Design a protein with these regions (language model features):
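A mid-sequence interfacial segment
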Residues: 83-118
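Glycine-rich, aromatic-bearing surface loops/beta-hairpins
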Residues: 117, 121-142
Length: 142
């Protein structure tokens, strides 16, 4: 399983953004990342600053971690592409039809964060079925 360190993740985004801005050749994963970075102009100054790789992004300070946020976009895109956990693609499609791709990702992100928080707190593996159920509920809520 691919399990990069925090520093490797941050360097991935910084170098992909730099190559994207310079018109360089990107890997398929970097192309997906660059698309999400383009959709988040609020992060672009930090992505252009190599010092951002060593910053703390404490929620208590009201700072969103751009690397975590973009990583979640990549995770969700991968999950949807392979329908893992099963049912996530259908739930995403329902959300996308109502909200558009970007907003659908943000709704799914809330469920993903909730699932990971619950798993950490309970010292159990992430519950993919509960995650998909959360997304389905939000996709069908009026």
């Amino acid at each position: 399983m691919f399990n990069p360190s925090k520093d490797e993740v941050r360097q991935f985004f910084l170098s992909a953004w730099q190559r994207h801005r310079a018109g360089g050749v990107l890997t398929p994963l970097e192309l997906i990342a660059a698309d999400w970075m383009e959709q988040h102009p609020e992060y672009q100054a930090e992505l252009s600053d190599t010092q951002s790789a060593s910053r703390d992004y404490a929620v208590e300070q009201g700072r969103t971690n751009p690397f975590l946020h973009l990583s979640m976009h990549l995770s969700i895109a991968e999950q949807v592409s392979i329908d893992q956990p099963p049912g996530i693609r259908q739930a995403f499609e329902l959300l996308r039809s109502r909200l558009g791709e970007h907003d659908a990702h943000h709704v799914i992100m809330e469920c993903l964060g909730e699932m990971l928080w619950t798993a950490q707190r309970s010292s159990l593996p992430p519950d993919g079925a509960a995650y998909v159920d959360c997304v389905q509920r939000r996709a069908t809520a009026r």
